[in-house]
C-alpha cells in the first residue's frame, strides 16, 4: 500500500491535509490518474521510500505528578460560579428526527460567550440522557457556518433515534470561536495548555446549562470525542467527574505535545469508564498511540474496552459502531 494525500471534491474539507492508505494502483474517481513530468528521473526516488511517522514516546518518559504537585496544578482548572446568562438564539423544528436549538452562554473567562447547539429527539417524554460531543480537527481549521452544523455529518443520528440528546458546544478555538489570526504550529503547541483550561471551563458551563433544563438528565451525561476530540480529551475526563462514561472514536495519544500538555502525566488518575473504537490501518492515529492511551489510564480493566476495525481513520464500520456505542451507554446509564 501507499499513502494518498488530499481528498476528492465530495469528501470532507479536512482531508485536504490528511493522508489515507490506498493501493498504489488505485485509480478511483476520487483519486483520478495523476501524472508528472520529471526533469530528472532520480527525483522520483523518494516517493518509493518508506514514510517515517513519529512514534509515541515510551511510557517511561512520563513521570506522574505527586499528589502535592497535582493539587497545585489543578487550581488552574478550577471552575467558576459566574452566571450563564443564557440566551436562546433560535429553535428549528424542521428536521424529522430532532429539534435544534442554538443557545448563547457566558464562558466565565475573558468576557467571552459560547454557543451551545442542542439536538433533542422529537416526541421524547421525560428527561433525555445527554451526549456531549467534541468533533474532529476540521472544526478547528475549516469549519462550516455554525448554523449548518448537525450530527448527521458523523452519522450520530443513531444517538437521537435512541432517545439521547446531543449537545455540541462551540469549544474554544472551533467553529465561530476560531482565533482571528492563524497560529503557527509552534504557537499552537505553546497555546495548548491554555486551550485545555478553556475547554474545562466550557465543559463546566455546558453541565451548568444541562442542569438548568428540566427535560435533560444531568445524571446521565456521556462524553463523545471523535478524532481530535478523542486525542486531546485527557483533561476533560480528569477534571469533570460527572461524565458517566466516554466514547472515543479513532482516538489515542499524540506524541507531538509537551508532557505537561499532552495529558499522559495525568492518565493514571483517570477512572472514567470508556469505549475506544479505532482503525487497524489508521495512519493518523496508529495502533501504538491508541494502546498508549488505553494502557495508561487508571480505569479498571472491566470498565474499559478497545476495538480495532479493518478500516482507516474514518469512517468506522457503521453497524458495529452503533452496536458497541449503544451497548456501552446502556451499561453505564443509571
What positions do the PLM features span?
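C-terminal catalytic histidine-bearing segment of alpha/beta-hydrolase fold enzymes
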Residues: 41, 299-334
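N-terminal cap/lid segment of alpha/beta-hydrolase-fold proteins
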Residues: 77-126
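Short beta-strand element of the alpha/beta-hydrolase
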Residues: 115-116, 126-138
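Short beta-strand/loop motif that positions the catalytic acidic residue
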Residues: 270, 276-278, 282
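Acidic catalytic loop of the alpha/beta-hydrolase fold
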Residues: 280-285, 314-315
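Disulfide-stabilized, aromatic/cysteine-rich ligand-recognition loop
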Residues: 2-53
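Gly/Ser-rich "nucleophile elbow"/oxyanion-hole loop immediately N-terminal to the catalytic nucleophile
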Residues: 126, 184-227
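Cap/lid segment of the alpha/beta-hydrolase catalytic domain
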Residues: 137-201
Amino acid at each position: 500500500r501507499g499513502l494518498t494525500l488530499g481528498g476528492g471534491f465530495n469528501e470532507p474539507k479536512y482531508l485536504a491535509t490528511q493522508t489515507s492508505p490506498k493501493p498504489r494502483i488505485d485509480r478511483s474517481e476520487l483519486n483520478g490518474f495523476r501524472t508528472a513530468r520529471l526533469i530528472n528521473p532520480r527525483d522520483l526516488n523518494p516517493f518509493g521510500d518508506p514514510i517515517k511517522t513519529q512514534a509515541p514516546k515510551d511510557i517511561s518518559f512520563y513521570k506522574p505528578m505527586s499528589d502535592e504537585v497535582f493539587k497545585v496544578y489543578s487550581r488552574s482548572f478550577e471552575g467558576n460560579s459566574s452566571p450563564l446568562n443564557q440566551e436562546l438564539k433560535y429553535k428549528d423544528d424542521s428536521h424529522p428526527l430532532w429539534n435544534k436549538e442554538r443557545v448563547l452562554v457566558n464562558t466565565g473567562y475573558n468576557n467571552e460567550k459560547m454557543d451551545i447547539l442542542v439536538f433533542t429527539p422529537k416526541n421524547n417524554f421525560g428527561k433525555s440522557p445527554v451526549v456531549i460531543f467534541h468533533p474532529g480537527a476540521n472544526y478547528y481549521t475549516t469549519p462550516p457556518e455554525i448554523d449548518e452544523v448537525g450530527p448527521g455529518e458523523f452519522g450520530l443520528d443513531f444517538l437521537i433515534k435512541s432517545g439521547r440528546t446531543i449537545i455540541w458546544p462551540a469549544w474554544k478555538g472551533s467553529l465561530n470561536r476560531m482565533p482571528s489570526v492563524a497560529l503557527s504550529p509552534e504557537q499552537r503547541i505553546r497555546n495548548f495548555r491554555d486551550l485545555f483550561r478553556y475547554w474545562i471551563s466550557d465543559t463546566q458551563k455546558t453541565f451548568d446549562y444541562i442542569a438548568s433544563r428540566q427535560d435533560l438528565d444531568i445524571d446521565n451525561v456521556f462524553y463523545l470525542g471523535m478524532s481530535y476530540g478523542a486525542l486531546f480529551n485527557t483533561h476533560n475526563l480528569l477534571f469533570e467527574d460527572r461524565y458517566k462514561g466516554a466514547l472515543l472514536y479513532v482516538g489515542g495519544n499524540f506524541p507531538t505535545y509537551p508532557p505537561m500538555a499532552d495529558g499522559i502525566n495525568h492518565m493514571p488518575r483517570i477512572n472514567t469508564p470508556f469505549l475506544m473504537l479505532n482503525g487497524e490501518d489508521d495512519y493518523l492515529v496508529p495502533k501504538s498511540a491508541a494502546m498508549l492511551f488505553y494502557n495508561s489510564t487508571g480505569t479498571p480493566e472491566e470498565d474499559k474496552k478497545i476495538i480495532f476495525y479493518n478500516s482507516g481513520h474514518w469512517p468506522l464500520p457503521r453497524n458495529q459502531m452503533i452496536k458497541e456505542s449503544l451497548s456501552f451507554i446502556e451499561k453505564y446509564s443509571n
